[in-house]
């Protein structure tokens, strides 16, 4: 068995990636989220495949086909809710994975980090298009509002929006193409994940100390396969509690009303995992400015290697930057809350303050804290 594992041209790639991979001996449970994201992707592809067998991407039957899946298909309700709540678990793992990378300075592995940002954009695009497919009220109006943002692009904006819509409004052509893209993107994401792993295995994993761990490595299997399996059990338990007890808690009640272009919902809002970016978008009165802020709220992650001023890699031994980091986490939670609130006083001013704080902490305060900590270290 060992000979096959180490000599077979295909199996040896798997062996070097998941079995004999040298891993730092001290990586904590924060390093579990990569494998959990892989599991989420597999769950989403499998449940999505079975949903696609029964779904019809036509405006007149899309809503009914989703109802049919829940009522008439064997365990259709389970597949549908696993897919919908699986997306939420996916984003929880994604945010924790990115947060871990920011905390421990993993962004210094630039190729892996940039690949991760591309993956984040791809997953967000996939989730947005998936939300449109049930063709409920929030699906329709969410699609209308978000695609309309592209009209803020000077000169080509309006043409671009109509090109994406396939007409002069969100209609049959839009739904069909969104279904096509929503189906193909997870497979593209899978390919990007392999590239992400390829870059990661070029440098090896980071660790909580931020120090070089070449002198102290252990094989991935059995140590981290067992450790990851515990994470898998916790994730699956969390997902099944959501699916079986609170399947609609993260959804919007408006999406149980079929799409009606003549009736606008009181508050148009995306799924919870986009609310922080939506709050940043809404906090700027200018349309183009809002769109740029929206894109920058994610793209700013690409600047982190340039904004790294500390002599140390992670925040493990840096209390000032740690404080800034946790204020940033609290700020993101405030933005998420504001994104789900109506556009009125006092939510407008809270959103604007939180948006300014978000960019200020990342671009100014954290790099400054790094320099202050360097000076404190030099004082000895």
From Swiss-Prot:
Cofactor note: Binds 2 heme b groups non-covalently.
PROSITE patterns: CYTB_CTER (PS51003), CYTB_NTER (PS51002)
Chief location bin: mitochondrion
GO biological process: mitochondrial electron transport, ubiquinol to cytochrome c
GO molecular function, one term: ubiquinol-cytochrome-c reductase activity
Keyword RNA-binding: no
Transmembrane segments: 33-53, 77-98, 113-133, 178-198, 226-246, 288-308, 320-340, 347-367
Taxonomic superkingdom: Eukaryota
Residues reported to bind heme b b562: 83, 182
Subcellular location: Mitochondrion inner membrane
Binding residues for heme b b566: 97, 196
UniProtKB keywords: Electron transport, Heme, Iron, Membrane, Metal-binding, Mitochondrion, Mitochondrion inner membrane, Respiratory chain, Transmembrane, Transmembrane helix, Transport, Ubiquinone
Cofactor(s) required, per the database record: heme b
UniProt membrane topology term: Multi-pass membrane protein
GO cellular component: mitochondrial inner membrane; respiratory chain complex III
Family recorded in the similarity comment: Belongs to the cytochrome b family.
Known partners and oligomeric status: The cytochrome bc1 complex contains 11 subunits: 3 respiratory subunits (MT-CYB, CYC1 and UQCRFS1), 2 core proteins (UQCRC1 and UQCRC2) and 6 low-molecular weight proteins (UQCRH/QCR6, UQCRB/QCR7, UQCRQ/QCR8, UQCR10/QCR9, UQCR11/QCR10 and a cleavage product of UQCRFS1). This cytochrome bc1 complex then forms a dimer.
Note, other: Heme 1 (or BL or b562) is low-potential and absorbs at about 562 nm, and heme 2 (or BH or b566) is high-potential and absorbs at about 566 nm.
Function field: Component of the ubiquinol-cytochrome c reductase complex (complex III or cytochrome b-c1 complex) that is part of the mitochondrial respiratory chain. The b-c1 complex mediates electron transfer from ubiquinol to cytochrome c. Contributes to the generation of a proton gradient across the mitochondrial membrane that is then used for ATP synthesis.
The protein's name: Cytochrome b
Organism: Alticola macrotis (Large-eared vole)
Gene coding for it: MT-CYB
């Amino acid at each position: 068995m060992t000979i096959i594992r180490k000599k077979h041209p295909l199996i040896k790639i798997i062996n070097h990636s998941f079995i004999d991979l040298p891993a730092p001996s001290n990586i904590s449970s924060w390093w579990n989220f990569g494998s959990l994201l892989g599991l989420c992707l597999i769950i989403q592809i499998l449940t999505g495949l079975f949903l696609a067998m029964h779904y019809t991407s036509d405006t007149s039957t899309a809503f009914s086909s989703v109802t049919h899946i829940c009522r008439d298909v064997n365990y259709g309700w389970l597949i549908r809710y696993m897919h919908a709540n699986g997306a939420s678990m996916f984003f929880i793992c994604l945010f924790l994975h990115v947060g871990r990378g920011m905390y421990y300075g993993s962004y210094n592995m630039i190729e892996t980090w940039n690949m991760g940002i591309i993956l984040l954009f791809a997953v967000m695009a996939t989730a947005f298009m998936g939300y449109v497919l049930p063709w409920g009220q929030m699906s329709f109006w969410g699609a209308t509002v978000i695609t309309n943002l592209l009209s803020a692009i000077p000169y080509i904006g309006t043409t671009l929006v109509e090109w994406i819509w396939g007409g002069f409004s969100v209609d049959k052509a839009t739904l069909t193409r969104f279904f096509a893209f929503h189906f193909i993107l997870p497979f593209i994401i899978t390919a990007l994940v392999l590239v992400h792993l390829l870059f990661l295995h070029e440098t090896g994993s980071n660790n909580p100390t931020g120090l070089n761990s070449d002198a102290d490595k252990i094989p991935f299997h059995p140590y981290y396969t067992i450790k990851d399996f515990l994470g898998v059990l916790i994730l699956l338990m969390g997902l099944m509690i959501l699916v079986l007890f609170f399947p609609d808690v993260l959804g919007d009640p408006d999406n149980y009303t079929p799409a009606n272009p003549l009736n606008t919902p009181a508050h148009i809002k995306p799924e919870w995992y986009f609310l922080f970016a939506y709050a940043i978008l809404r906090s700027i009165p200018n349309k183009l400015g809002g769109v740029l802020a929206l894109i920058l709220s994610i793209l700013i992650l690409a600047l982190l290697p340039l904004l790294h001023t500390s002599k140390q890699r992670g925040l493990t031994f840096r209390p000032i930057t740690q404080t800034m980091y946790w204020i940033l986490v609290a700020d993101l939670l405030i933005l998420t809350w504001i994104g789900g609130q109506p556009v009125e006083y006092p939510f407008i001013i809270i959103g604007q303050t939180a948006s300014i704080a978000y960019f200020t902490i990342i671009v100014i305060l954290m790099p400054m804290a790094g320099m202050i900590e360097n000076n404190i270290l030099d004082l000895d």
